[in-house]
Amino acid sequence: MRPEPEPEAEPGAAAIGGRRAAPAGRPDGGLPGRPGWAPLVPLLCGTFVGTLNNNVLNAPLRLVVASLRVSVSSGALVVVSYPLALAVAMPLAGWYADRVGRKRLFVASVLALCVTSAGASLAPDIAALVAFRVLQGLSSAAILPCVMGLITEIYEPGRRGRALGLWAAANGLGQTVGPPLGGLVASSVGWRFVFVPAIAVGLVAAAGAGADRRVPGGPGHRSRLEVRGAALLTAGTGLVIASAMLVPIVHVASVVAILAAVGVACLALLAFGRREVREPFVDPQLWREPSFLRSSLAAFAQMFCLGTTLLAVPLYLTRSGSLAPASAGLVVFSLPVTMTLLAPVAGVAAERVGPRRVLRSGLGVLALAELALAALAGSTLELPLLVVSLVVAGLGIALVQTPAAAGATRSAVGRVGTGLGLFNSARFAGSALGGAWVAVVLAHAPRYRLGFVVAAAAAAAGLVATFAGPDSPRTSGSRAAVSTGG
């Protein structure tokens, strides 16, 4: 039975995760009155910490593997295990946020991330470090769905686009600071101290959100977990990504192929299996909604390119001692800083020329930038041209991230925790697979050019996906309704 449609959501939101998204005081979402931007600050700090931990070990990775006496391809697990855990756990974390309350789970998740970050800094060997990176990812899996959900609760549609632009900027800032911070700290005092800044900011985020009454702290809504759907989605996502991660490590192709096949079978059974459930974890008809699907595919492609580039470029620059880790981190800095500065501008551009045009422009620019990196990887190192290519890649990512996130939150699927978890799962699955792809191309003779070419192909595939389906209906009179990926 379908509920009545809401002004900013399409009918059917109740069929995801077992409940409808509950407006927080306004018929179109948003708190009563006109809340300022202060409640957003601790949420952005939490977003920053989660993103920072994703790539803080990229630049000093060679120092890490030398310290732990493992190969670079094995050490790449340290990088990709974090987004793998995020991608697997986010849909379930989003569902749980709806059940126990987004604010409560946000604070708990940030504190857990601080604890597991301290554990990672004390890891005695590669196995322990990878395990703590997985725990870091699981701890932070709820942060992004909670933040996006709280933004929709706090801000009405007229201001939600700008809030999501700031959210995208916080994501970019974490990507900006991660490589140079990791390289600088590791070169100065050792790689085990790279998590200390994130712990400090995380404690501030948890304290700020917990103390601010303007951050909605409702108890959540009781709902039953549809175990079959949750298990299929979690197992399918995890097995597909894990199989890609294991390619350079497990030299038995049949093992990897079996894991991948089982993962694909789980996802196919979830998507196409016929089973009447009163409260499905994810209704396949809804998560195939065009607006949500193209936003998720665009975000996946963008993060695949980002994960590939932020891992491959530092390794390329530090090969055979070409550059120190700190210097490599500063070169890579040009990509995320561009992404951070232009994220709010992308929201304005979407309002003026339309979100799908911005998405298409961003993915096209990103594909060209990856091809430029491929060309440079096969020639004599030209740092100025490399920096220009990274800046162009940052421009492309900025033009994708904000409209894709806004489009996901506006769709019926994206108005509940499970849907927000699915969207962010797609993002970090892209990041994990991008890092895994780099491990594959470096497993034997390094083939950096091939790594960037495949990233360009992923961006091109995302571009093709933006032509699927009609535009979503927009609420008249709301400029924010235009700044979406719909």
Language model: regions and residue ranges:
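Cytosolic juxtamembrane N-terminal segment immediately preceding the first transmembrane helix
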Residues: 1-52
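12-transmembrane solute porter fold
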Residues: 35-59, 68-94, 103, 110-111, ...
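Membrane-embedded alpha-helical segments in integral membrane proteins
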Residues: 58, 62, 115-122, 172-187, ...
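Helix-terminus/helix-capping segments at the ends of transmembrane helices and short amphipathic helices
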Residues: 62-65, 132, 151-156, 161, ...
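Helix-loop-helix hairpins in multi-pass membrane proteins, especially solute transporters
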Residues: 90-227
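Membrane-embedded alpha-helical segments of multi-pass transporters/permeases
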Residues: 118-122, 206-211, 267-271, 371-375, ...
